[in-house]
Amino acid sequence: MGQAIFMTGTGTEIGKTVVTSIVALALERLGMSVSVLKPVQTGLAEDGVSFAEQYWYERVAKLSASEGMYYMEPAMSPHLAAKLTGTSIEPERVAERLEWLKQRYDVVLVEGAGGLAVPWCERDGRFYMTSDFLRDYQLPAILVSLSSLGAIHHAVTTAAYADAQGIRLLGLMFNQFQEQEIIHQNNVETIAALLRLPVLAVVPLLPAVSRRELETLAQHWIEQGKAKQLLEVLGVGV
């Protein structure tokens, strides 16, 4: 059976989809079979028809295997989008699909919507949070963060919330990194030191993203030894 990793972030619009694509392409280059699951998707892509993340995975990253489950047009928190569209989000169905994928792939990357403290739905008089799903099904997570101003607070508070919810963080991945900016350099070092987590990737700020650019970054990630480091943490051999 394969391993599942939940790709979460310190917020929305920080590039989880880009980072997830790089990880998927790198692991495939190492001979692993990889699937990406985006269980809850809200908001449309630039074409005004497709759903944003699925559009990205299929048409930009061109991953061999990616899928979603709940698609909702309003670009808002899943619980509100579900209420407005009459959608019933069932975490048990997501878990069943995830188990099905784990039977068929070495690694399944599950991309969340926003961060850990995002409600999927309301049930039994309470909100069912993203963190509830990770805890209920014992999913380890990678924390994707920006490296710009404000990143320290966002990363530290997210990690504290994860710890309080009993969620295991495997490591950190930084996105939109600007090497010439001292604040970016120091934020990466400071966050890693404060959280005592390994830095598994530092993705530069990209003016434009294409499949070729993603492949280049994936190869660089492999050459740095970070892909194998992640697999070692998971106990997956290559």
From Swiss-Prot:
It is an enzyme of class 6 (ligase). CDD domains: DTBS. Its EC number is 6.3.3.3. GO terms for biological process: biotin biosynthetic process. ATP binds at residues 13-18, 111-114, 175-176, 204-206. The active site is at K38. It catalyses: (7R,8S)-7,8-diammoniononanoate + CO2 + ATP = (4R,5S)-dethiobiotin + ADP + phosphate + 3 H(+). Its main location: cytoplasm. Pathway: Cofactor biosynthesis; biotin biosynthesis; biotin from 7,8-diaminononanoate: step 1/2. GO terms for cellular component: cytosol. It holds the Pfam family AAA_26. One of its GO terms (molecular function) is magnesium ion binding. Substrate binds at T42. Homodimer. Belongs to the dethiobiotin synthetase family. Catalyzes a mechanistically unusual reaction, the ATP-dependent insertion of CO2 between the N7 and N8 nitrogen atoms of 7,8-diaminopelargonic acid (DAPA, also called 7,8-diammoniononanoate) to form a ureido ring. This is ATP-dependent dethiobiotin synthetase BioD. It comes from Geobacillus kaustophilus (strain HTA426). The gene is bioD.
